[in-house]
Design a protein with these regions (language model features):
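Hydrophobic micro-sites
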Residues: 4-33, 217-257
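Extended, non-globular alpha-helical segments
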Residues: 33-61, 131-133, 148
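Inter-motif core of Ras-like GTPase G domains
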Residues: 191-209
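Conserved nucleotide-binding/hydrolysis micro-motifs of P-loop NTPases
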Residues: 104-106, 130, 151-154, 186-187, ...
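Phosphate-binding loop that captures ATP/GTP phosphates
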Residues: 90-148, 212
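Walker A/P-loop phosphate-binding motif and the immediately C-terminal alpha-helix
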Residues: 44-113
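Phosphate-binding/switch loop-helix module in NTP-utilizing enzymes
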Residues: 131, 149-189
Length: 257
C-alpha cells in the first residue's frame, strides 16, 4: 500500500503486510534518560519493558539470540532509554547481561548510569594493552555490566567494521548471556547496518508522533539489505488520551507476515 510522508500516529500502517512485532511503550519513557525499570520497578512502563523481554525470549525458541542491536530511523526516538531499561530487565532474571554503548557519535550510557566514560569501547578497540575486565563497569546494586563508548573517535564506522571489533564480539559472546548494542539511527550513518550484519537480531525503536513513515520504511530496507534479522519493533511515546492501549503490545508473527 502507498505510504504517506507523515509522522507515525498509530501502529496500523506498520509496513503494510510486512509488519512484525509491535511493542508499545507509553510516554513516561521519554522523561529523561532514566532507568525506570529500576527506579519504579512496579510501574506500568517497567512492566512494558518486561513484556518486550518476554517477546524477545519467544523469538529465541528456534535460534539462539544472544547479541541484539537496538536502533531507530532517526534521533529522539527513545532507543538509548529502551536499550538501558531492556538490559536492566534481562539482568533481573539472573542472566549475565552487557549493555554496549556502540553509538560512538552521540553516546549516552555513561550519562544514564552516572559512570565514567574515560575508557570504553573505543579505547578497548584502539589500545592493545586494555582488557575487557579493565573496561566494563558493573552498575551498583544490579547484575548489569555496561561498556560505555569511550572517547568519541574520528572513525566510528571503521572501528565497528574492524577485525578487532569482530574478535571482541566473539569474546563478549563467550562471557555473557545477553549483549545489547545501542547504535546510532540507521538512516544517518552506516554504523547500525555494519553491526546489524554481525549480531543475532535487531530491535527497531519507533516513536509515536516523531518517526516519519518513509524514514522508517527506508531504514527497514537498509537493514534488510545486510540480511539483518529484525526481531521486532518497539512503538513508544503513547499517550493515555491518544486512544491506544496504555500498555501491552501487538504481535504479528513472521509466518503471518
Amino acid at each position: 500500500p502507498e505510504i504517506e510522508k507523515t509522522r507515525i500516529g498509530d501502529e496500523k500502517y506498520m509496513f503494510g503486510s510486512n509488519k512484525k512485532k509491535i511493542m508499545k511503550l507509553d510516554n513516561q519513557q521519554r522523561k529523561g534518560l532514566s532507568l525506570i525499570s529500576k527506579m519504579k520497578p512496579k510501574s506500568v512502563i517497567a512492566e512494558q519493558y518486561r513484556t518486550i523481554r518476554t517477546n524477545i525470549q519467544f523469538s529465541m525458541v528456534d535460534r539462539e539470540v544472544k547479541s541484539i542491536v537496538m536502533t531507530s530511523s532517526g534521533p529522539w526516538e527513545g532507543k538509548s532509554t529502551t536499550s538501558a531499561n531492556l538490559a536492566s530487565v534481562f539482568s533481573d532474571q539472573g542472566k549475565k547481561v552487557l549493555l554496549v554503548d556502540a553509538d560512538l557519535r552521540k553516546p549516552t550510557a555513561h550519562k544514564t548510569f552516572g559512570i565514567s566514560n574515560l575508557k570504553g569501547l573505543t579505547t578497548l578497540l584502539s589500545l592493545p594493552e586494555q582488557t575487557i575486565l579493565d573496561t566494563v563497569q558493573t552498575i551498583t546494586g544490579t547484575d548489569l555490566d555496561v561498556l560505555t563508548s569511550g572517547p568519541v573517535p574520528p572513525n566510528p564506522s571503521e572501528l565497528l567494521n574492524s577485525n578487532r571489533m569482530n574478535a571482541l564480539m566473539k569474546q563478549l559472546d563467550a562471557m555473557y548471556d545477553v549483549i545489547i548494542y545501542d547504535m546510532p539511527p540507521v538512516t544517518s550513518v552506516t554504523d547500525a547496518q555494519i553491526m546489524a550484519a554481525k549480531v543475532d537480531g535487531v530491535i527497531f525503536v519507533v516513536r509515536h508522533g516523531v518517526s516519519q513513515k518513509d524514514a522508517v520504511l527506508n531504514a527497514k530496507d537498509l537493514l534488510e539489505n545486510v540480511n539483518a534479522n529484525i526481531l521486532g519493533f518497539v512503538l513508544n511515546g503513547i499517550e493515555k488520551k491518544s486512544g491506544h492501549a496504555y500498555y501491552g503490545y501487538g504481535y504479528t508473527s513472521e509466518g503471518d507476515a
